[in-house]
Amino acid sequence: QKQILDYPLFVYVCDGTDSEKLDWFRIINIAGEQLTDQELRNAVYAGSWVSDAKRYFSKTGCAADTLAGDYLKGASIRQEYLETAISWAASAEGKTIEAYMGQHQNDPSAVLLWNYFRSVIDWVQAIFPRKRKEMKGLPWGLLYNTHGKRTDLDPKKLEAEIQRLMGDEDVTKKSGIYEYLLTGEERKLSIRAFDRRDALAAYEKQKHKCAICGEEFEFEQMHADHITPWSKGGKT
């Protein structure tokens, strides 16, 4: 105890704007276990709001972990759950995390953030009731902000599509299925590209000739593509 009490400390008193303080915290955050970006933000925007928000999002076994641990990546005690929730809520209002925290810094409670977060998870569980490991870490809040008011999302039809796509060997990114079903963006699935073996087999089968013009080309001059697009049932 004496060694601890007698240990000399450096004390920094920071003046300036919130952004200047945040930059200064980043400069001195170089020794020991480095703080995460959200831990630094919590220091800069310390107040009643952050204290209450941490009650929901920042403790082992916290309410957010109990409700949505299967959907979130990171660790609550390193403020990653809190960062995720704030980033989603801030995005809904077209703001940065820093701007959102600055706006609410002196609010007496973070119940609005918690209610928003619960709405996100309730929506996810309503349209995708079956939990899968591929759901962990997806940008659910951003998807909710865009698609949360849609009335055309049928959970049974979505589940049937999920099962079909999970069994499709050409879909190499299974976690992208959920975003694909909501956005229609095929790139989310990372459809399996032709490898050299597949392309060479097709090249030999076609006797080195282009299937479109009928001319003969060297293999390196040819490009392999689906006869029928993947979206219409074509296979790689």
How does the language model describe each region?
Residues 5-8, 206, 223:
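A generic structural signal for well-ordered coil/turn residues at beta-strand boundaries
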Residues 169-212:
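Short, charged surface segments at domain edges that flank catalytic/cofactor-binding sites
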Residues 1-2, 210-215:
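Intrinsically disordered, low-complexity boundary segments flanking structured domains
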